């Protein structure tokens, strides 16, 4: 509750945790399946296990953890967030997670999940990482080679390339003048999706874990490489820490799947000491 109410307040400035839990309990009462997308910020990032165990306690089997990274930049039209095009402008928002926090959060959470919860609780980034390890589609655009399939429509009918790119330069049109098919299958949108791969800096292209993250979301690529090349993901250090940490576990689960065995076998292997992890 403390994590939630620190930022999640209603329009009167009051905490909203109780209302959210009432909604969840109503869904459970009527047998409605649900999942959670939890934002990881500067506060809750330091408590990964408390955060994860809470979701397990309330019966949430499907969890997506989304790191929040935003830059503040005021515009004349009233906007206060910096777009990717403004990659050298803006100030990192106080609520943003650091790369180190993100890496530590994922590793700590994974260590509990891989020992106790494989096949019981489904954490999207772990599932997506295993999919990429297998050479399959990851099921989430941020970790895919290309993107462009997650357009968003605003209340007035304006359509943008992505819900992370609701900026004037990424507006595709309006539903009153163009169809969704026209906009989402346009050359402009196709180019937007391909730029996810084409705009990667050399450091990413030469990285041993490119296959696993594919540069993550372009929205976060406002940092520079050690050589000064633009386009490096702000969270790169955290993701690299995570992939390096989980590599031997992913190798084991991949082998299980390749041999038509459940990846959940890793829990028994770890328990029996059959799987030796060396970093």
Regions found by a protein language model. Give the residues of each.
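Flexible mid-to-C-terminal extensions adjoining Fe-S/redox cofactors in radical SAM and related proteins
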Residues: 166-279
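A cytosolic small-molecule/anion-sensing beta-strand core signal
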Residues: 155
């Amino acid at each position: 509750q403390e994590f939630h109410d620190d930022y999640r307040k209603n329009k009167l400035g009051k905490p909203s945790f109780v209302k959210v839990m009432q909604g969840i309990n109503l869904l459970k009462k009527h047998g409605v399946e649900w999942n959670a997308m939890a934002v990881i910020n500067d506060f809750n990032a330091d408590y990964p296990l408390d955060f994860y165990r809470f979701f397990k306690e309330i019966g949430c089997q499907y969890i997506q953890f989304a790191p929040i990274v935003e830059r503040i930049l005021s515009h004349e039209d009233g906007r206060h967030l910096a777009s990717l095009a403004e990659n050298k402008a803006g100030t990192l928002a106080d609520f943003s997670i650091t790369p180190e926090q993100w890496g530590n959060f994922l590793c700590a959470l994974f260590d509990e999940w891989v020992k106790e919860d494989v096949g019981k609780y489904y954490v999207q980034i772990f599932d997506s990482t295993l999919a990429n390890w297998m050479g399959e589609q990851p099921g989430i655009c941020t970790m895919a080679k290309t993107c462009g399939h997650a357009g968003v429509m605003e209340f007035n009918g304006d359509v943008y390339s992505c819900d992370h790119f609701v900026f004037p330069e990424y507006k595709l049109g309006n539903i009153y003048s163009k169809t969704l098919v026209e906009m989402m299958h346009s050359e402009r949108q196709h180019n937007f999706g391909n730029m996810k791969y084409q705009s990667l800096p050399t450091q990413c292209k030469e990285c041993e874990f490119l296959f696993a993250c594919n540069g993550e979301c372009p929205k976060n690529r406002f940092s520079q490489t050690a050589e000064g090349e633009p386009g490096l993901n702000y969270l790169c250090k955290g993701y690299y820490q995570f992939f390096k940490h989980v590599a031997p576990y992913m190798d084991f689960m991949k082998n299980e799947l390749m041999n038509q065995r459940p990846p959940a076998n890793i829990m028994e292997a770890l328990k029996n000491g059959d799987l030796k992890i060396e970093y």
